């Protein structure tokens, strides 16, 4: 186990070194940028951006250079060097790191991927494509304008790593289209189940899965909106349904098919021909005395029971937990820039570091005591802090797992709480912890 964290770090360091050798692909001007020896060469800049947490920029530089007055550089020098780096480096680094690792955990031989999105608040800029204009509330009050990116992500819930991600300016939000673009680009060597919530299902969504090798879906649907579901009795059930999606409106009405206008094809909401036969399995189960959940899936009944479907959909919560850790442990809420390209750099840097930390933590084995009431697991918040310090070489290789296992917490299954939604704003540069 001790050598595993060193192996992960060597893999990431090796990828950074190899990509840095071809830095001309990732700089704004290959003829001028990073051609002379400076205090902040290309590879150092990359590791510095990867290692940043949520402090002020000066504090990040102070920590990175070991508090050595001969080594520390000014924030303006850092920004000047950063301007020369394309955000594409960090996007490619995220994918290259994933491609270099083998994440083995499966459920009945299937990879389990959750699909979701999360809004990311950034600094105010009324001229940016991320700007959301003031709107009137139900009370007639005018809100303030603000800026957001939307992170569309695919997350491996068993191996606890981000598999793919795409960014959109929040005003251009289209989660379904972003997911289908990622799905179409993915290579799936083994069977994979994608779990999604109510905002994702559409005829185009289902048709894409029909044509994608090794891709299966488990998706929650709205009882009142889905044509195949809304007339079903409100009881527990497990049935099959079939429809033909067609853009021939007249034929659709006469035959009882699911039809849509040709505008959907023109707008990119339909990726196939005029007709597509679609088959579904519809599962409905109770989640309380008065509430039911309705799931549509492509999984075969002989391999996956209703209990399996219920368990799979519950796994989707893993991506919600990951967003919280990504934002408030890794530091995605605390950016060090206003410029869009710098923000994209930091978002993909944080995704890479999240995966780096999780892959190390996954090898930590917590010894269970039969005399204890609960089973125990690693405290992921502290585990990630230790891994980030290890990346900065502030923690010795041999001490990583002994430190991680100092911080464990009880697993208390069955707990639930009402989700508390609160509006959040960008964390201003002048309101950062400098300790």
Question: Model-derived features: where do they sit?
Answer:
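Short Lys/Arg-enriched helix C-cap and helix-to-coil transition segments
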Residues: 89-104
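Single, function-defining residue in the core of a domain
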Residues: 1-55, 63-64, 72, 77-85, ...
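Conserved beta-strand elements of the Class I
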Residues: 111-113
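Short Pro/Gly-enriched beta-strand edge/turn motifs at strand-loop
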Residues: 132-138, 263-268
């Amino acid at each position: 186990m001790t050598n595993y964290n060193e192996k992960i770090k060597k893999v990431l360091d090796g990828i950074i070194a190899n990509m840095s050798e071809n830095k001309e692909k990732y700089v704004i001007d290959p003829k001028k940028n990073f051609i002379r020896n400076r205090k902040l060469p290309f590879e150092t800049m990359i590791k510095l951006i990867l290692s940043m947490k949520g402090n002020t920029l000066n504090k990040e530089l102070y920590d990175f250079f070991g508090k050595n007055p001969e080594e520390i550089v000014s924030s303006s020098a850092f920004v000047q060097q950063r301007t020369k780096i394309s955000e594409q480096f960090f996007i490619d680094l995220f994918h290259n790191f994933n491609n270099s690792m083998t994440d083995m955990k499966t459920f009945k031989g299937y990879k389990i991927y959750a699909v979701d999105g999360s809004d990311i608040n950034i600094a105010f800029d009324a001229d940016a494509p991320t700007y959301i204009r003031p709107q009137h509330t139900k009370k007639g009050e005018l809100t303030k304008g603000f800026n957001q990116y939307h992170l569309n992500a695919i997350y491996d819930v068993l191996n606890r790593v981000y598999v793919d991600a795409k960014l959109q300016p929040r005003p251009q939000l289209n989660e379904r289209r972003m997911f289908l673009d990622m799905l179409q680009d993915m290579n799936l060597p083994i069977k994979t189940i994608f779990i999604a919530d109510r905002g994702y299902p559409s005829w185009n969504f289902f048709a894409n899965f029909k044509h994608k090798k090794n891709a299966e879906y488990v998706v929650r649907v709205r009882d009142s909106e889905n044509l195949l579901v809304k007339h079903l009795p409100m009881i527990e059930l497990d049935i099959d349904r079939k429809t033909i999606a067609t853009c021939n409106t007249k034929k659709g009405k006469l035959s009882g098919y699911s039809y849509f206008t040709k505008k959907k094809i023109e707008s990119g909401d339909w990726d196939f021909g005029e007709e597509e036969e679609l088959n579904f399995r519809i599962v409905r189960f109770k989640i309380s005395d008065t509430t039911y959940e309705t799931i549509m899936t492509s999984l075969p009944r002989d391999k996956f029971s209703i209990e399996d479907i219920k368990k799979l959909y519950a796994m989707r919560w893993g991506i919600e937990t990951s967003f919280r850790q990504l934002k408030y442990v890794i530091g995605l809420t605390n950016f060090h820039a206003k410029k869009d390209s710098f923000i994209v750099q930091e978002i993909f840097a944080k995704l890479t570091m999240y995966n780096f930390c999780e892959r190390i933590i996954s090898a930590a084995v917590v010894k269970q005591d039969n005399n204890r009431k609960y089973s125990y697991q690693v405290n992921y918040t502290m585990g990630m802090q230790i891994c980030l310090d290890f990346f900065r070489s502030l923690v010795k290789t041999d001490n990583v797992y002994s430190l991680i296992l100092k911080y464990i917490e009880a697993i208390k299954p069955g707990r639930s709480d009402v989700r508390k939604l609160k509006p959040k704003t960008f964390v201003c540069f002048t309101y950062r912890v400098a300790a």
